[in-house]
Regions:
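A short, well-ordered alpha-helix in the C-terminal region of glycosyltransferases
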Residues: 188-202
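Conserved donor-binding/catalytic core segment of Leloir-type glycosyltransferases
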Residues: 31, 41-57, 63-66, 79
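Aromatic "clamp/platform" in nucleotide-sugar-dependent glycosyltransferases that forms part
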Residues: 129
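Conserved acidic donor-binding segment of nucleotide-sugar-dependent glycosyltransferases
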Residues: 161-173, 181-186
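Short hydrophobic beta-strand element within catalytic cores of glycosyltransferases
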Residues: 146-149
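Nucleotide-activated donor-binding/catalytic signature segment of Leloir-type glycosyltransferases, i.e.
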Residues: 91-109
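C-terminal alpha-helical cap of glycosyltransferases
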Residues: 205-218
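Short alpha-helical donor nucleotide-sugar binding micro-motif in glycosyltransferases
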Residues: 108-109, 116-121
Length: 218
């Protein structure tokens, strides 16, 4: 993919493809860090999924990760933003497993709601089977929301090979162990959130496009 196609996608209006750090927000790194710190002091952990409810995005695996954390006694909430062909299947799974109190299918959301989702969540989960330009990973890091993602495309690079987020192995118990290790230690979560903010804020949209294009094109 070249910079032209990346730019065209960046200009599209969908939540998935529109790269927008909402840099008009006047919060600086200090206030972002303080907010990330305050989130770790809460007893409840907020998880976010943003994407189509399709097999390629694996939203069922997202639900199962949070479900297993819940079974292990963690106070967790998951919100999924997006629509897709798997919605009925996910609704059935949530109902059959009595997860209505912790898992919420929110449908498509506007930019303002997505922004608030990043700001209020501890983690973004993205277990995609493929990802051309993982905009949501960088946006999550920008707002101090730690990504949990599959190592596709340039995701491992973006996440510092695990220093700025949790890299999924797509084996449920192993992945839940990884997440549990982060949420059990406040300093580990804060370090990941802080490093993600520092890394993502190096980039303007143009610079980010150029860097990702270089990675994708080798």
């Amino acid at each position: 993919e070249d910079n032209t196609s990346l730019s065209l996608r960046a200009e599209s209006g969908t939540n998935e493809d529109n790269f927008d750090f909402a840099q008009s927000d006047k919060e600086d790194n200090t206030s972002l860090s303080l907010r990330a710190e305050s989130r770790t002091n809460e007893n409840q952990f907020m998880f976010l999924f943003i994407g189509t409810l399709s097999k390629g995005k694996q939203p069922l695996y997202v639900i199962q990760l949070v479900e297993e954390l819940y079974k292990r006694g963690k106070n967790v909430i998951l919100e999924l933003y997006g629509e897709g062909s798997l919605r009925k299947e996910l609704e059935h799974y949530i109902s059959q497993n009595n997860l209505e109190a912790i898992v919420f299918l929110k449908g498509n959301q506007n930019k303002e709601t997505v922004l608030k989702g990043y700001q209020n969540s501890h983690f973004l989960i993205l277990p995609s089977k493929s990802e051309g330009w993982p905009k949501v990973v960088a946006e999550a890091m920008f707002w101090g929301c730690v990504p949990i993602a599959s190592p596709v495309s340039c995701v491992s690079y973006m996440m510092g090979n695990g220093s700025r987020g949790v890299i999924l192995r797509e084996e449920l118990n192993q992945d839940v162990d990884q997440i549990e290790a982060v949420i059990s230690k406040q300093e580990v979560y804060q370090k990941m959130a802080s490093e993600g903010q520092t890394w993502s804020r190096q980039f303007t949209t143009d610079k980010f496009e150029a860097e990702i294009s270089k990675l994708l094109n080798g």
